[in-house]
């Protein structure tokens, strides 16, 4: 251990040449230390334990603690709220902000796991009204719009029609504007003064449209899960028959034709069900009674066999 010398100028005692040299060397060491430990605005001032001591860095526990705490940041469950508050994907079980495995990445998974049907009932009623033709004009326009979206792009080259139309529009407007500038000696055009404001998209209206589409998709997704888990066995059996028919049609129909057939079935079968609802319910009730009778007879047969 080297001899320690005080740097306090107000301390009493005799001053020798060795004391002056030691004080000078200590002052130089202090200046070098302060220069090495530059203080940034975002950091705290160094404490007294950060200055040089008699022990080297490898043997000084204070310096070891400081270096370890600066090189290895401490994270706790409270310091990372994004990992706990981010939605968990029910498909992959991953956090949107931590695992980066969901399709929506930081936004989380687009699917939620819930026990309630969080869908506006008006959307379900409106969709059923369209499919059952309660409003004929709305159902007809919806069906024609879907068929037009399927067949019009195959009949008409829409990009070519778009550019062929606007090449004449842009040419005519530029000629008219140049003519107005030429007639007024470059002071005033013709068409450039007609526009009073710019037309932009309303984000709120787009959000409402997207939300309506998502609600319709959720209705179909919920109905598919009800069929899949046999909440209504008759409906599940009907869906299996429809799937068999679709499997048969997919053997010789193209994707477009198969899609059109599905759309037509979606607009025809619900209407047939509504028109024949009483007879269908009577048939279902008779089938249930027959099933109960067969179940009762089978139970009685098993009981008599066991008793013998």
From Swiss-Prot:
GO terms for molecular function: membrane bending activity; sphingolipid binding. It comes from the Eukaryota. GO terms for cellular component: cell division site; cortical endoplasmic reticulum; endoplasmic reticulum tubular network membrane; nuclear membrane. Residues 1-17, 41-66 have a biased composition (Polar residues). It is a multi-pass membrane protein. Residues 67-81 have a biased composition (Low complexity). Residues 1-22, 41-92 are annotated as: Disordered. InterPro entries: Reticulon. GO terms for biological process: cell division; endoplasmic reticulum tubular network membrane organization; endoplasmic reticulum tubular network organization. Keywords: Cell cycle, Cell division, Endoplasmic reticulum, Glycoprotein, Membrane, Nucleus, Transmembrane, Transmembrane helix. The chain crosses the membrane at residues 138-158, 166-186, 233-253, 255-275. Glycans are attached at residues 65, 113, 135, 303. It is found in: Endoplasmic reticulum membrane; Nucleus membrane. Residues 127-308 form the Reticulon domain. Interacts with TTS1 and YOP1. Required for the correct positioning of the cellular division plane by delimiting the actomyosin ring assembly at the cell equator. Overexpression causes cell lysis. This is Reticulon-like protein 1.
């Amino acid at each position: 251990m080297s001899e320690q010398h005080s740097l306090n100028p107000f301390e009493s005692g005799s001053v020798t040449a060795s004391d002056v040299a030691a004080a000078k060397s200590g002052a130089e060491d202090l200046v070098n230390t302060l220069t090495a430990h530059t203080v940034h605005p975002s950091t705290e001032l160094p404490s007294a334990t950060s200055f040089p001591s008699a022990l080297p860095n490898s043997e000084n526990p204070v310096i070891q603690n400081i270096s370890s705490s600066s090189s290895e940041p401490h994270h706790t469950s409270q310091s990372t709220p994004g990992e706990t508050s981010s939605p968990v994907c029910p498909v992959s079980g991953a956090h949107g902000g931590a695992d980066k495995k969901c399709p929506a990445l930081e936004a989380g998974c687009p699917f939620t796991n819930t026990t309630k049907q969080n869908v506006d009932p008006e959307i379900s009623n409106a969709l059923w009204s369209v499919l059952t033709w309660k409003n004929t004009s709305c159902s007809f326009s919806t069906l024609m719009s879907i068929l037009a979206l399927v067949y019009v792009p195959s009949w008409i080259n829409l990009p070519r029609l778009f550019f062929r139309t606007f090449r004449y529009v842009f040419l005519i407007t530029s000629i008219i504007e140049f003519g107005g500038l030429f007639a007024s000696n470059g002071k005033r055009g013709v068409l450039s003064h007609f526009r009073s404001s710019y037309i932009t998209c309303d984000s709120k209206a787009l959000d409402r449209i997207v939300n309506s589409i998502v609600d319709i998709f959720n209705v179909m997704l919920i109905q598919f899960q009800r069929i899949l888990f046999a909440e209504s066995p008759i409906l599940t059996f009907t869906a299996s028959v429809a799937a068999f028919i679709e499997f048969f049609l997919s053997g010789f129909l193209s994707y477009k034709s198969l899609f059109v057939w599905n759309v037509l079935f979606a607009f025809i079968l619900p209407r047939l069900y509504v028109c024949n609802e009483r007879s269908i319910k009577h048939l279902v009730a008779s089938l249930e009674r027959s099933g109960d009778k067969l179940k009762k007879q089978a139970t009685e047969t098993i009981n008599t066999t066991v008793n013998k």
